[in-house]
Amino acid sequence: MTAPAPKLLQPITVGPLELKNRIMFPPLTTGYEERDGSIGERSLAFYERLARGGVSYIVIGDVAPVMTASPTPKLATDAQIPTFKALADAVHKHGAKIALQLFHPEYDVPGVGRMVMGSMAAAKAAQEAKAAGDEETFAAKMAESNEIRNQAYAKLHHDMQHFVNEASVEQLTQIKEAIAASAARAQQAGIDAIEVHGDRLVGSLCSAILNQRTDEYGGSFENRVRYALEVVAAIKEAAPQLMVEYKLPVIMENPDGTPRGKGGLQPDEACEFAKLLEGAGIDMIQVAQANHTGNMGDTIPPMGAMPYNWTLPVAERVKALVSVPVATVGRVVSVEAGEKILEDGVADIIAYGRSLMCDPDIALKAATGEPIRECLNCNKGCVDAIQNRKYISCVLNAENGDEATIAIKPGEGDKKIAVVGGGIAGLEAARVAAKRGYDVTVYEASDHLGGQIVLAAAPPRKDEIMRSVEYYEKILPGLGVKVELNHAATAEDLNAADAAIVAVGAHDVVIPVPGADSDKVVSSWDVLAGKVELTGRVAVIGGGLVGTETAEYLLQHGCEVAIVEMLDKIAAGESETILPLIMSDFAEHNVEQHVKTRLTAITDEGVEAICTTEDGAEEPVKIACDYVVMAVGSKANAFDLDGVTVPVTCVGDCSGERTADIASAIRTAYHAANEL
């Protein structure tokens, strides 16, 4: 248990609203809404779960005031009002307040929409022709559909860079009116607040980097922020009963001092703008990172990319200049961090975004002192999903995204459960089984918990992943779970329980080529575990997640590295927000990348391989090296079930579903324990 967090739990008045605590869920694009942008069961369940967990203020991200093809919520017609009213009612039941973040995309929505509809119409005509046996018309209409679609994509790509400068004053006025109309609908639906999305189109107009206009909306600082202030005024006029918040995107600095983001204001201008916003009647300001770079990781950075609470210095400056509440967001991963920010008086409200996806009960646990499940900032299930237009989920929270259908069930009588293996899957199985009221014992053959997570935490920037293990070490004793280290479970141990969950993980494998038994060949797992120390030039066989991370680890320890990968690119499964960091590291250290290359032999001089060229030819490749590191995947471990008489379920890497995948480990363990 940790100390309760009294500052986080203090109420605060924001405009016309009384928030019961200082914990906020900031806007995130979830992908949970219906195809037309209205609120469906998945959205409703997700946001109500946050409210039930004690969050005081929830912002629905990227709500469009017009109908677009983008997978975001939309409040563009009166017909959508009832679904938003249902959302407001669900959140209000738990004492939370709810806001809509209104935004407009940075493109000509009607123009792109007409092109998309034209493409769909041509495709429909093609299918009708095909059904009638008219192959000539079918081919012509399909070609027409594809051509229009390609033109739509080209226009979209162009507009994302240039619409801010090409939009007419008339178009900007129409967009402003659409935003105001959406705010009026929100008020009618019982929504409590509107957050102006200060990034996207509005932020692009504010930006001295992106805004090259020469009219009243371009040039000087006053002109660049003019439209944003007009949007604020339009919202306040259309929905006078609502609290109005402004998300203030700021172009921060990377650790190397270079600018981070484009679609916002520099810190000095942001501070000046904050004063103008207060004068315009804004009730609250959320200081955030500017975006518009094409990489979501710039706005929502992965572990190790930016310091914790990295936007806080600007939030502190803004708070000193305005009298309205100021929220801070950005890698606030613990209750203690949020409490410290409030104690220091540098912000008034703490926005826990990814953290609340990971643990929606942060507010409740802040009151009791129960440890929270801290977000890893891995970005695998959430930010990558946003980038790829999929619905988001948290790798550590098997319920996330399916709150309507998944929850821990009450136990069925008194049961003893044996869990074999203290890796992440075994620990999650133990947690869920114990939450159901069962008597749980974890048997771990080694002297520590964590399994492969310990290896995953070794590469640069990845040490934060150990928070996943530390969480279980904190909570399992309080749940009554017994952990026996240095204990290889036996059939007798399992038979003493009513059921067993086996989570014995996987082992790494070696490609059986000539020379694979050489002393110069080592396992990537042994490298990451610190069992071997390599020097000189190293060839890493396998350019997947483990291979690339091992390569970075070796670079950090002074080695020269070459990577041999059979696929056409390395790090195929890595987070898209982390991949640029890896590639930058490789470029800085001149890492050789041999893709579409198959290992054939290991010799005293190095490795021999075959590379498939672009034209399909095969060419021999020789890479000189002092050591060869095998990082070619893993294979599920087997547990000897001879003599075991109780029901057994395998989870995690040994389940056969997918190895070296934390989301799979958590999911299989959760569901197995929930069905005992």
What is the role of each PLM region?
Residues 411-445, 484-492, 496, 503-520, ...:
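Rossmann-like dinucleotide/flavin-binding elements
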Residues 439-479, 551-599, 655-658:
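Rossmann-like dinucleotide-binding cores of NAD(P)H-dependent redox enzymes
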Residues 285, 318, 341, 353, ...:
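Hydrophobic, well-ordered secondary-structure elements that form the walls
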Residues 10-12, 44-45, 271-272, 313-315, ...:
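A generic local structural motif
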Residues 606-610:
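Short polybasic amphipathic segments
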Residues 322, 345-346, 479, 517, ...:
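Short, structured coil segments at secondary-structure junctions
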Residues 1-420, 424, 428-435, 439-440, ...:
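Flavin-dependent oxidoreductase catalytic cores
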Residues 329, 397, 486-488, 524, ...:
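Conserved beta-strand termini and adjacent loop/short-helix elements that scaffold enzyme active sites
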